[in-house]
Design a protein with these regions (language model features):
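PLP-dependent amino-acid enzyme catalytic core
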Residues: 1-496
Length: 496
């Protein structure tokens, strides 16, 4: 059955998957959502016998219904290849009885690679299907990981250009180095004087600037988005939840149909929303455990039913989760409002006006599958140290937030029998200083690359290629701008 995509903010004409991917954001500023969530049409047993690529096809074909089998399989083959340093693409590592789903084996060693290695292929296929002649300009705001993963995905992809905005003082040194050393004539990286929310708001504003869109069209350009507001990012993220269950089943760790919990370190709410969609496709998931850092808007939301961004923005050791406006939550709000675009639009207007909104009791009741909690900086560091001491497994700061929240969940609920998958979203090599300092304060005196070698030793893991590459790479991007000058910067880059 065909899946069409509606905006979360108005009842316009639904669009096909390829059109939603090309546009990124709907014209009314809303996000595209599937008109229904398709059910898995392969049994769990069948899925458990498949490779990652095969599972990805079985999931994505159900959402991207206007892609032919050949188109989709080609995209999948090109995305999930030897760019990943393991054949299984997303390995499951057991530590202390929980299963860490390592989503960081792609070229930029964060989970964003899972979707951004396929998005460029989905995008150019969509452009071809829709007879688009314009060059596609990918505009991206990043809290650190999306930027590099999108740059790596789109670099030198014909018919595309990519512009990445990151908060100049809000990413880790390794994240910044990864971005500013990006090669490719079609890439452009800009540090903004502001935080991630400023970058994201600026990008959304540029997207909804109708005059600019017209001007761009005249010069042969059109915008699209590589942020997780693009449905072409969300759908590929559903696949690894299905694959993790398939792996547990294949390895005899779970019984066919037995439910598992999923813990997700959350920022923009894209990753956990993908898990929610997986559950709605029929994957046996019990609780969706949403883990936040000190920017605990989501924890407060799940507890009180009020989403309130009026608070201090905290810079933490898990920068990819330093977010006060979780964009993808809008897709969940729309759904629990009964797919009511008017209601959702009202709440989003309150969010942009007063910085907060409150959901009804009925809507709150529809969130029963979610459990929210958070870990502060000390708890996050302690969790890295605790897990390393107990079993030698080293996790990054984001994964540590999830792991610490899982410990809180266990304590609160006693639910230790349910098998639990913890999304491990970045390699510890990406946040080496925070990780090593958490393990022992003595490491603070070492340089970034000395720490990399030390981490390799204590974790008994070879240094990933992504880190080796930046040791000596020259800086090729040094543009900075104020948050309110983002549009001018874009125009300069495009020479319009
Ligand atoms: C992006 C990111 C997150 C947050 O994911 P969302 O989909 O934005 O909730 C968590 N951890 C890491 C390492 C990330 O890069």
């Amino acid at each position: 059955m065909e899946v069409l995509y509606n905006s979360t903010r108005s009842k316009g004409t639904p669009v096909k998957a390829s059109e939603a991917i090309l546009k990124g954001l709907s014209d009314d500023g809303g996000l595209f959502v599937p008109d229904h969530i398709p059910a898995l049409d392969k049994s769990l047993k069948e899925l458990s016998e498949m490779t990652y690529q095969q599972v990805a096809y079985e999931v994505m074909k159900l959402f991207l219904t206007d892609f032919t089998e050949e188109e989709l399989k080609t995209c999948i083959e090109r995305a999930y290849d030897s760019k990943f340093d393991t054949d299984v693409i997303a390995p499951l590592v057991e530590a202390e009885g929980a299963y860490y789903l390592e989503l960081f084996h792609g070229s930029t060693i964060a989970f964003k690679d899972m979707a951004l290695s396929i998005l460029p292929h989905l995008m150019i296929t969509s452009a071809r299907k829709n007879h688009i002649k314009n060059e596609i300009v990918i505009l991206t705001a990043t809290s650190g990981d999306t930027g590099k993963a999108a740059l790596a995905g789109f670099a030198n992809v014909e018919g595309t250009r990519i512009i990445v905005f990151y908060p100049k003082n809000g990413v880790s040194p390794i994240q910044e180095k990864q971005m500013v050393t990006q090669k490719g004539d079609n890439t452009f990286v800009v540090g903004i004087h502001g935080n991630f929310d400023d970058a994201q708001t600026g990008v959304k504003k540029i997207f909804s600037d109708k005059e600019l869109a017209k001007e761009m069209d005249g010069k042969g350009f059109q915008f699209s988005s590589a942020n997780s507001i693009n449905i072409g990012r969300l759908v590929p993220q559903i696949c690894y939840y299905v694959y993790s269950y398939a792996t547990l089943l294949r390895e005899g760790k779970i019984a066919d149909g037995e439910k598992m919990n999923v813990v997700v370190p959350t920022g923009n709410f894209g990753n956990i929303l993908a898990a929610f969609y997986a559950k709605n496709m029929g994957l046996p998931i019990a609780k969706l455990i949403c883990a936040s850092n000190d920017n605990k808007v989501l924890y407060d939301f799940f507890r009180t039913g009020t989403y309130d961004r009026n608070r201090e923005f905290m810079l933490t050791s898990s920068p990819s989760m330093d977010i006060l406006i979780s964009s993808n939550l809008e897709r969940l709000i729309y759904r629990i409002a009964g797919n009511d675009a008017d209601k959702n639009r009202e709440l989003m207007a309150a969010l942009s006006g007063q910085g907060k909104y409150e959901i009804s009791a009925d809507m709150k009741a529809a969130l029963a599958d979610f459990y929210g909690n958070y870990a502060n900086e000390a708890e996050t560091a302690d969790e890295i140290k605790r897990l390393y001491r107990s079993c030698g497994y080293v996790i990054d700061t984001h994964t540590a937030v999830a792991s610490a929240v899982y410990q809180k969940y266990l304590k609160e609920t006693g639910d230790s029998n349910t098998k639990t998958v913890i999304a491990s979203t970045a390699s510890p090599f990406k946040f080496t200083r925070s990780v090593m300092n958490a393990i022992d304060a003595k490491y603070d005196a070492m340089s970034d690359f000395e720490l990399v070698d030390e981490l390799s030793k204590i974790a008994n893991v070879t240094v990933p290629q992504a880190i080796e590459e930046i040791r000596t790479a020259p800086v090729v991007h040094d543009t900075q701008c104020d948050a309110d000058k983002m549009k001018d910067t874009v125009k300069e880059f495009l020479h319009i």
